[in-house]
Amino acid sequence: MKNYILIIISFFLITCDTIEPPYLQSNNQSSQKIVLIEKFTGHKCSNCPDATRKIKELQELYQDAIIPISIHPGGLKEFTDTDDNYIYDFTTNSSDVIASDMGASFLPLGTVNRIDGGISNRCFTKDQWASEIEKLLYDSEGLPRPKKFNIDISTVFNTTKKELTIETNIIALSDVKNNFNLVIIIIEDGIIAPQIDGTEFIESYEHNNIYRCAVNGTYGENISNSNGLENQFEYQSINTLILNQDANHNWTSDWDNINNCYVVAYVYETESLIIQDSVKKAIIDE
């Protein structure tokens, strides 16, 4: 018997360039469907940290398949207003509109891809989130539901000007009917400020996933017409934002927390308001 040995030798030439600011970042795509949770919360809401702990449990279970956003509704001032003990203002005009439109009549509550149901319009209690997430991620046979859209985000951040340019590219992965919008927002982690937790006042509580601003409007921009989209339809959106007090009143000249900020983009069907697919990426990857 003769043995034949085929040896294939490949040579790769790798060159390294020095990259200076501004920095370009892009998110990695996966085939996994992602669910967006809008958690309505408040720093004066004694039960809200329980909802935050529930979010952490769900993240341990579903990993990157969920994206949580924390919204402090300005309309529920008894939970979100500022005073001598709670000096940090987490509210924004855009998030106030969302909280009102979604039916956040008390706290804590949360939407799950903005599907209908729950106890208040589209709002569910924290103990209802898991079952709704499960139904959105998996079909009745336990198979993963396919994504409808591929959303890719690239960012360029100029550290000197605090200028952020976001390029968002969308591809429809199948023929889809109806009308769709793209929403782009900024969220921020690692904000240390007071929070009531049960009966305990915590002066140095870490607030994460905080809704900071809407980049392209509260309800975004249209990417289609009423006739829907064909498979492999492509759409590109480029937006530039200065991270200063015009974008969010907390982004003062001495603010320096860009390493804890993220871009979240999602596509929703305009008639039902139901979110189809979402993605999140750090503005500056470490």
Sequence positions of predicted segments:
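Loop/turn elements at helix/coil->beta-strand transitions in domains of secreted/extracellular proteins
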Residues: 32-35, 63-67, 106-107
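A general structural signal for stabilizing positions within well-ordered secondary structure
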Residues: 31, 60-62, 100-101
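Sec-dependent bacterial lipoprotein signal peptides
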Residues: 1-14
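Typically the conserved alpha-helix immediately C-terminal to a functionally engaged Cys/Sec
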Residues: 47-63
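Short, conserved sequence motifs used for protein processing/export or organelle targeting and
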Residues: 70-286
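Bacterial Sec-dependent N-terminal signal peptides
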Residues: 11-40, 46, 286
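The canonical Cys-X-X-Cys-His
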Residues: 40-51, 68
